[in-house]
Amino acid sequence: MGNGPLDWNSFVRVCREAVWGPVAVLLIHAVAGELFGHEPYVDPVMHFSGGLAMAFFFQRTCSIASGLFGKPSRLGIDLLAFGLTCAAALFWEFGEFFGDLYRGTRVQRGLGNTMRDLLLGTSGGILYLIAARIVGPRRNDLKVNP
């Protein structure tokens, strides 16, 4: 493949450097949910952790494949990562809703539960992005599509 923003090397880098976070949260959520039950502790912690992991994933992916978006600034990448993290939290809740509706599961326990999950996912994403700004590398130090 070529050297474009979505070439094979970029895909491999995303898999190696970014995918592990969300995958780890999903695996921990499945195991901890089975061991301890999802409510009242595992589910909230995992939604927050999911927000952290998704913000990490989207920030790394947008940095690695930055050519796809032009030449975004670090703020641009952070804003894109935040928006995509919020979208991921929203679509996760849609999945829970439709699972309850069509598969007869009882994952969502009401509006309060859904709003809590959205708030925790968003908060996890915000915390990651702020922490990455404080302790992370500067824009010039980021390995953007080398």
Residue ranges of predicted features:
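Bulky hydrophobic segments
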Residues: 1-110, 122-146
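Short aromatic-rich membrane-water interface segments that cap or initiate transmembrane helices
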Residues: 109-117
